[in-house]
Structure formats: C-alpha cells, structure tokens
Amino acid sequence: MTISSRSLLAGLALLLGVASPRSAVAQSAKAGAKTPAKPGAASVGAPTSMSVKRLPLAVTDIADIVTLEKLEDRRDYDAATLQRISTAKHPELRRRAALAIARLYDPRGRALLRAMRTDPDTAVLATVAWATGQLVDTSAVAWLDSLLQGTKTPVGVATEAAGAFGKIRTSDTRLRLSLYLGNATAGPRTAPVVAEALLAIGRHRERGAIGAIVRWAQSADVELRWRAAWALFRNRDPAAIPDLMALATDPSPEVRFWAVRGLSGARADSSDVGSAGTRPVLLAALRDADRRVQTEAVRTLGSYSDAGSLIQLTLLLNAEDMWIATTAAEGIGSRGDKSRAAIAQLVSSTESDNPTWIRAAALSALADVWLAAALEPATAMAKDTSLTARTAAAQVLAKLGVGAREGLESLLKDSDRAVRATAWTGYLSLADTADELPLRRVARRGAFASQDVAVRAAAAASMAKWADASDIPTLLAAFAVALTDSALIAQESTIEALADIEQRGGGAAAAFFAKYPVAPSDAVYGFAGRGFGAKTIAAWGTGRPVRTTRTDADYQRIVESLIIPVYNGGPAPRLRWETTKGMVDTELNPLDTPLAADYLLQLTAKGTMQHVRFDRVVPNFVVQQREAETNEPLQRDEISRGRLIRGNLSWGSNIGNAPRFPGRGPGAAYDTGPAVYTFGVTPQPHNEGDFSALGHVIRGIDVVDRLELGDYVKSVRVLKPGEK
C-alpha cells in the first residue's frame, strides 16, 4: 500500500480550504528541531497556503454574517433566522449557518441540517456533515455512511462524514468505520478520508475488530501510520500489543511515540505477550533519539509494577530533560506505597539545588508514596521564592494534617490567591480532629467573615466532607457575599460544598434554587450544573445566562475587520508571544473563530497578556497558561473544521459533546470557560469537536517544546504586516 504524504496533505488542504491562508508549522522529525516549514510538510489538518477564489459578499450578505455572530455569541437559537440564512443564495452564508447551528448545540438544529443535505456546494455540504456529527444525530447515520462509502462523494465531504462517526459513537458507527477502512483502496483521493476514519475509530470507547486499523499501520505513508498507531493505542485492546510493538520501531518518531504510549503494563499483562515481552521495547525506547518517544517510554514504564521498572524510573529522576525527569516522578507516584524504595531519591530531588519543576513533581510523588516523608521537604518548599514550589508545597501540606501546621501557617498570607486558598483549606481542616461538629464550625466562623476571597473559599471547601443540612444557611450566606467578589473561587467552593450536602442527604439544592430562582451569572450556572446536575436544568432551564459587553457595532467591526479581509484572501492577524523561554509566533484563524480572535486581540491591546504564568505543562501534550483576568465572561468556544494539530492554539475550555461529561451536571457540556490559552505540543485527535482551532504556531514550536511549569508569557503583541 503506497500513498504519498504529499497526496494526503494536498487532499486535506483542499477539504480544509476554509482555514487561514497561510502555512502551518512543520512537523519536524525530532521535536524541538528548528526546521522551517516546507511545502507539503505541514501536519495534516493544518491551515495550508493556497489561493482560493471566492464569491464576493454583498452588503446584505455581510449583514447576515453579523447576525450569525451575534446569535452565536449570545447563544440565541433563532430558528427562523437560522433557517433563512441556511437557504441563502451565497454559499458562504449557508456554510456559516451550518457552523452556527452546530455551535449553538441545540437539538432543534438537527432538523435544519437535514434540510441542507442536498446542498450543491461542496464546502457547505462538508460543513453540514461535520455539524451533524457535532450534534450527535444518530438518525443521520445511514446518510453519513452513504457519503463515506459513495464513490462520487467529494473528498472533503467524505472526510467529514468519517469524522462525524467519531462523534456519534455507537457500535453501528464503529462497524461502518471498520468496514470502510477494511475495503478502501489506497490512493490520493482516499488518503484524507482514510486518515480521518482512523482517527474517528480511535475515538470510540468500546473495543472491536482491529484488523482494518492494522492494515493501514503497514502503509508507506507516515501520515496514515501514525494515525493507525494512535487508533490502536486508544483502542486499549490487548490484541493490539504485537502490532504496537512493531510500530514502536517505525522509522518515524511520530509513529513510535504513539505506539509506545499504548504498551501499558495492564494491557500487556492481558495480552499473549505479557509485560515481560513488552518491557524490552520500552527500555529500547528510552534510548530513542527523539525526546517524545523517550517521554512516552517513561510514562508507560510507570504503569509497570516490577522492581526493575521502579529502579529505572528512580534513575531517571536525575535526567537533565525535565520532560523525562518529571514524567518519571509521576510514574513513581502512581505506584503508591509500592514505590517506597524510591523515597530517598524523591526526597533528594526536592532539594533546592534541583530545577523547580522536578522539585515540585518529586514532592507530589513523595506524598503519594509515603505522605509522612513529605512533611519536611514540603515545609521547606513552603518558604521558597518559586510559586511552582510553593504551590506543590501547599497541596501536600493540606493533605498532611496536624503535623503540617508550621508549613501551612507560612503560606496563609502568600501573594498567590490559589496558594492561599489551598493553605487555608488545610489549616482550617486542622480543627477537624475534634469530633464535635459545633467546634469545627466555630473554627470557620472567622474565615467566613474574612475580606480575602481565598480564605472564604477555603472555609467552604474545608467543611465539604462533613457539612450537613444545618450548614446550608451559612453556606448560602457565604455564597451571597461571594457574588460580590471579582474572583470566582468562593462561589465555586460554596456551591461544591452545598452539592456534597445534597448528595449525602438532600435539601441543599432546593434551598439554593429557592433563594436564586434565576441563575446569577454564566459562571454560576456552570458551577451549579456540575454540582446539582439535572436539578439545575429543572430550576434554571437549559439556557446559560450570557454575559457579553459586545454591541451591534462590535459585531459589525469583528466581521468587517477580521472575517471579510481573510475571506477576500488577505493575511490573518499574527501575534508574537514573548515567553521566558523565547519567542513564539502564532497566526489566528478569524474566518472560523472570529469571536475568539477578537477577544484575544482585545486582551492584547489593553496589555492584559503580560506576566501570565504557565500553570499546566504536560510533557508531550500541552502547555497551558492560567486565566489572564479574574471573573472573565465565559467565551464562546468556536468549534470548527480546523483540526487540533501540533502547534494548535486553543483555550482550556470546551463545549463538549454530552457523553464526554457524564455524572453530576451539564455545566461543562453546555458552553465554555475563561480564556486559558493553550499550545498543543502534539496532535490531539481525542479532543476533536470539543476545542477550537483558534490559531496555530507559525514560528517557535521549539520554544513551546522547551516551556516548563512556572514559565511565563512576558508579553503578547500584534505583528505588523510583513514583519519578521
């Protein structure tokens, strides 16, 4: 089977032709290499430089686009308006209507999409297929399958039909994907469809036949092989172990790191090979020339229970590469007290002469292995000048209890709100050694009266495990005060405490919704949804309150200054992120994510994007900053057909297909969150349909790879046209 990567990339460039008209960051063979982008070298799904001739937009067309942006931003499902624009003469209006229907995430939109299934425009029909998947329309399976299997279906349409089957996750759709992959012939036309079908079948949770996936693992095209490796890794089927072992020696590191990630200990032990057979493959991967492969080998080794693996992980705590060292620490911690032999080395790794990230990771692992052994290093790190060190110390000290009083007291006035909240939670919990609940409540009385939102948040959080119906008035009063705060942490913690009371005996939800018959804010709707589940919908309905300051003039400005210029072939806005590790340039995608692009540009213009810490760094996955502002309005996460490639710029919030968020509530599944900007270090197929492709890195992906926990965004500015 031979399909050239160039053919696959060219096909996907055509099907994603609505994206920003500039080239994406190259996928270098070795992560971190400063390799310039070459024609045809961009990762699949990346915006690709191309000239697209589009029909001009009339004044009335622009007005309709303005209307759609307003409906999306205000979460207003206006059926009549959507139906009218979905039947407009101009194909771009129909395409954008399909986008809006999907993003509004209202089941009524399925009927509008059904009426669009015969659209003559390929880009529109592809968007309809994509939107049908977003709305998880199980009644559309036969139609989507006809597109997938049809020999005359345009490539872009068939590709989106395959992608939709990765969101409508049923036994039937998995079988249809398997049949397609088993029967598809190799060639330039089928390559993009096969690529998407491999990712789609990998998103299915239930196991099934893997032969059709394995078939493409033998392709000469690396773009198909890594997708096959990813699908086999995600499948979790022990039967795939031999195939993953073979792929772990593939010439491409893109293939190898996904394959190595799939060789987990439990999975190997359930296979005919056994962990004794897979462990040598991991040890070989530790010597790989590519740090991504090494990192995944360390991560996977953490799932093995043998003494030899523990010894190897312990040695790797001293690795110079922080991806390797911190991943080793996490692996040791995941084994719990079975890692006691590593205690001395973990303690040593917390000492001040080590890099801060490994100190924090080692302390967290030490607490997981033997909590008492973490007391002394945590107390010392509580006085550290590094926020990363103090954050880790606060989290561990809060778990320790009475013996941690000294360390907790040193953090009660910390300059960081999150550290203070964690420390106060642990400190107030010291009173819980008393069996009498009245004594515990007295200990929190002063905290609830504090002017510091972190202290009040901690007061609620610290009593969540034992509070009962008699505490409901106190928590409701605390919530009323929290509504006046600029930060949201006290609102969230009081609702969580009330939700815990509700779970233990009931009464809290009724009292809360009686006092607040209307959701006080967009954020509170989300907190209550996660806490009280269906009772939130019963009380407040399915419509989250919308908090936006955008006026009609703003929507007009966004369309005229961001959408129309790029639609007409102009350059997209580019931003330069100056970080503590170097410079990263990104290009935005205002054609499909105009609201998000405008919001980021507004934050940049007013100087908000300065000295913003990277609070979450997962080696070979993501680099994510904390919120740029407190009490931000929830942003519309503009999910689009742009793929989540390596170097993708998104934010750490998501609309979420409903099955992704089972349990206690609709909060996460209904909308978005604050703009926690995130760089994707790897492609993230499992998140397709849940996160926006806001932009992508065009320069500095090696800098992204070097960012560590605690690094900062120093500043962000807009690049001038032509600026290098």
Q: What residue spans do the PLM features occupy?
A:
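Compositionally biased, proline/threonine/alanine/serine-rich low-complexity intrinsically disordered stretches
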Residues: 26-55, 723-724
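N-terminal secretory signal peptides that target proteins for export/translocation
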Residues: 1-4
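Short inter-helical turns and helix N-cap capping residues of alpha-solenoid HEAT/ARM repeat scaffolds
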Residues: 89-90, 120-121, 152-154, 189-190, ...
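Stable alpha-helical elements in mature extracytoplasmic
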Residues: 78, 109, 140, 173, ...
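Bacterial N-terminal signal peptides
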Residues: 10-19
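Structural detector for internal amphipathic alpha-helices that build alpha-solenoid repeat scaffolds
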Residues: 53-76, 92-106, 111-115, 125-137, ...
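Buried hydrophobic core positions in alpha-solenoid tandem helical repeats
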Residues: 80-83, 112-114, 143-147, 176-181, ...
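Cyclophilin-like peptidyl-prolyl cis-trans isomerases
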Residues: 452, 473-724
